[in-house]
Amino acid sequence: MPNRRASRNAYYFFVQEKIPELRRRGLPVARVADAIPYCSADWALLREDEKEKYSEMAREWRAAQGKDSGPSEKQKLVSTPLRRPGMLVPKPSISPPDMSNLSIKSDQALLGGIFYFLNIFSHGELPPHCEQRFLPCEIGCVKYSLQEGIMADFHSFIHPGEIPRGFRFHCQAASDSSHKIPISNFEFGHDQATVLQNLYKFIHPNPGNWPPIYCKSDDRARVNWCLKRMERASEIRQDLELLTVEDLVVGIYQQKFLKEPSKTWVRSLLDVAMWDYSSNTRCKWHEENDILFCALAVCKKIAYCISNSLATLFGIQLTGAHVPLQDYEASNSVTPKMVVLDAGRYQKLRVESPGFCHFNSYNQEQRSNTSTGYYPSGVKISGPHSSVRGRGITRLLESISNSSNNIHRFSSCETSLSPYTPQKDGYKPFSSFS
């Protein structure tokens, strides 16, 4: 990874060739490093003879740079770092860009740093050949700091504009399966120019440098495209720096612990359903209609996840601005509840297990003190006769087994049937056959 710029390999030239195609698809690829995540799958599908073309390009480039000159392979390996030792240093882009932008010098500076989390929803995603890839319909943004939690939030619905011909059903289906915002005649929608102006006022109310904006890496292409589209519609030009939340979390961990966590762990940290239905998380319209997908909720849940994971590491007392306290306290409490999928099997294991011997005598005592009948689990009914039952399928199998056993005993018995004796499970055996 650190030597990628120093030694361009076949994959580098393959990615470089794919950049124009990625830009036509609306992806934010300004350089090769940005395009690498989008090309790995296509590279894996190439045959060896197809990859040879790019390997040849890499060899020609190294020859032009003078890296292939020399009498032996050993001299080539030694001469490269001696000639350009600076290339062995990792690229600045590997560390999250927010760390340099904020000029973090201490934990106190990190705690006081202001972060903006942004998300924009769309009525689906149109095919790559369409000029309009997304139709923005909702925007949410929160102002956050580790010290104060969520300080302010911004939310608005957006008029998506004219639906491209032939894609109305596609857009309606995408809306119905997620945020359920109407694709037309929505009374709460605002024009894109007004929404963008209000967003800029929220993010940058005072003169000075514009703060960086963060969103999830999976949403970055859509959010960036929608911002550019809204800028063209409103004729307002502001080059917002759109970064990823994953890089922000990695940077905070690096600053605090001098270690870099894996991106997989960071994504699992942010993708939780703990606060999906928490109060004051979704916008008013989605809350009233009981709809889970909301752009504002995505931003707030990012803040909740960061607070839950990072704020305590800095000794910060969590408040209602950091996480929904009622849900946070409930999640940390232990509920004495157990779900048993096969009650009959579980009861059998408990009786046979030596660790539950004292429960065995207790259960027998309870059987003699409870009445016959079916009652919900956990309900105790006093009565003369009762038996502990399993699930319905368990009782059915037991009855079939008992019936077959009784028939077998009847056919093989030469003497008269013994007097009726109640069975342990409450079922009567066959006493006569017609």
UniProtKB/Swiss-Prot annotation:
Pfam annotation, one family: HMG_box_2
Keyword presence, 4Fe-4S: no
Predominant location: cytoplasm
GO biological process: apoptotic process; cell morphogenesis; DNA damage response; ectopic germ cell programmed cell death; fertilization; gene expression; homologous chromosome pairing at meiosis; intrinsic apoptotic signaling pathway in response to DNA damage
The organism's place on the tree of life at top rank: Eukaryota
GO cellular component labels: autosome; chromatin; chromatoid body; cytoplasm; cytosol; male germ cell nucleus; nucleoplasm; P granule
Tissue: Testis-specific. Present in spermatocytes and round and early elongating spermatids.
Localization per record: Cytoplasm; Nucleus
Residues within the DNA-binding region(s): 4-73
Deleted gene: phenotype: Mice are viable but show profound defect in synapsis of homologous chromosomes in male meiosis, piRNA production defects, DNA demethylation of LINE-1 (L1) transposable elements and a 100-fold increase in L1 expression in the adult testis. In the adult testes, L1 transposon derepression occurs at the onset of meiosis. As a result, spermatocytes are flooded with L1 ribonucleoproteins (RNPs) that accumulates in large cytoplasmic enclaves and nuclei. Spermatocytes with nuclear L1 RNPs exhibit massive DNA damage and severe chromosome asynapsis.
Keyword Cytoplasm appears in the UniProt entry: yes
UniProtKB keywords: Cytoplasm, Developmental protein, Differentiation, DNA-binding, Meiosis, Nucleus, RNA-binding, RNA-mediated gene silencing, Spermatogenesis
Any one GO molecular function term: RNA binding
SUPFAM superfamilies named in the record: HMG-box
Subunit structure: Interacts with SMARCB1, SIN3B and DDX4. Interacts with piRNA-associated proteins TDRD1, PIWIL1 and PIWIL2. Interacts with Tex19.1 and, probably, Tex19.2.
Protein purpose: Plays a central role during spermatogenesis by repressing transposable elements and preventing their mobilization, which is essential for the germline integrity. Acts via the piRNA metabolic process, which mediates the repression of transposable elements during meiosis by forming complexes composed of piRNAs and Piwi proteins and governs the methylation and subsequent repression of transposons. Its association with piP-bodies suggests a participation in the secondary piRNAs metabolic process. Required for the localization of germ-cell factors to the meiotic nuage.
UniProt record similarity statement: Belongs to the maelstrom family.
Name of this chain's protein: Protein maelstrom homolog
Naturally occurring in which organism (per UniProt): Mus musculus
Gene transcribed to yield this protein: Mael
